[in-house]
């Protein structure tokens, strides 16, 4: 049971990651969280997309 639950969680996580990437991505100079990858085509440096 634990195995399938982990897989479901992983799937849901991947889905929300894709959604946040396409919908809530930010342009250069916007504040960002490195682990959230929420910059469009930019990398997160010092809390800002650059």
From Swiss-Prot:
Keywords: Disulfide bond, Ion channel impairing toxin, Knottin, Neurotoxin, Secreted, Signal, Toxin. SUPFAM superfamilies: omega toxin-like. Residues 2-24 form a propeptide. Residues 1 form the signal peptide. One of its GO terms (cellular component) is extracellular region. The keyword Nucleotide-binding does not apply. Disulfide bonds join 25-40, 32-44, 39-49. It is found in: Secreted. Expressed by the venom duct. GO terms for molecular function: ion channel regulator activity; toxin activity. Belongs to the conotoxin O1 superfamily. The presence of a 'disulfide through disulfide knot' structurally defines this protein as a knottin. This is Conotoxin Bu13. It comes from Conus bullatus (Bubble cone).
């Amino acid at each position: 049971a634990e195995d399938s639950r982990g897989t479901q969680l992983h799937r849901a996580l991947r889905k929300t990651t894709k959604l946040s990437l396409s919908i809530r991505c930010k342009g250069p100079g916007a504040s960002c969280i490195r682990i959230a990858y929420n910059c469009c085509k930019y990398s997160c440096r010092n809390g800002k997309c650059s």
